[in-house]
Amino acid sequence: DPQLHILWNEQLQEIHAQMMGQVQIEVLTQLIKERFGVVVVFGQGNIVYKETIAKPVEGVGHFEPLRHYAEVHLLLEPGEPGSGIEVASACSEDVLDLNWQRLIATHIMEREHPGVLTGSALTDVKITILSGRAHIKHTEGGDFRQATYRAIRQGLKSTESVLLEPVYAFTLEVPQEMVGRAMTDLKQRAGKFDSPEFGSGNGMDYAVLQGTVPVATMQDYSSEVHAYTRGLGHLTLELSGYDVCHNSEEVIAETGYDSEADTVNPTGSVFCAHGAGFIVPWDQVDNYMHLPRQFVPEEETQTPADGRSYETVSYTHLTLPTI
């Protein structure tokens, strides 16, 4: 069945089946039982959200418990939709040895970094190494991992984050007299679509709607289409990446994620005084950091083609060699 897709979700550590309604669920349940003797139950499923940023920001991470040392400054910028995480460097080797820069780049790319809205994975962000510092005696490899993670988190806390949700590209074909019902349904589901196209065939006048719609709003809609068109309608859905979440406030409230309470992914830094380390909250790091900030934004408000709103920054002093 070309409409059936089986996926392994690394984030949730689950097997996901993308199916088109209750009928397909019943058929697959029966097939698994007949072939493997296993009775399976399909749950409602979960929506995998992601997060990005709306404005550029410099994030600072410092890790200095006793006999450890690393400080990292990173520039986080909004990336192109679907670009994931990109890494570059604008840091001179005179400031930080290239081996340390490569280690920072490795730590940026070695994991999915949680956002600060819902703890969902960060995506579509370009991260540039601006500066950093090591200690000739006390720095170990793990110190830069801690400083890098904290720099990303501090940057996210210091700027505006955007919640993203998965969307379908859809094609909906219905009898022409039912196109009004279809358009109303899609609008209620936060769908975006062009004007309908009309045609005829197989003794029926039909209308075709095409566009995008959030995955979260389309649960069991194929069954609904089948019901109200008496089997004459046809809905095709195909995953089409991520877009700004249509109900961000509701999702954030339901998730109940508290970035300040996430001890596994701290937003603050660790400094040392009088032979003991102490934690500095993310919004006070500027008062303790050992290196000056490198990034001074020249803000120019614009609305990009994808509809996301953020501020761009002009900076001519940065060079971006490949690490």
Predicted feature descriptions by range:
Residues 1-318:
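Accessory interaction regions appended to the cores of large information-processing enzymes
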Residues 319-323:
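A short, hydrophobic C-terminal helix/tail in secreted or cell-surface proteins
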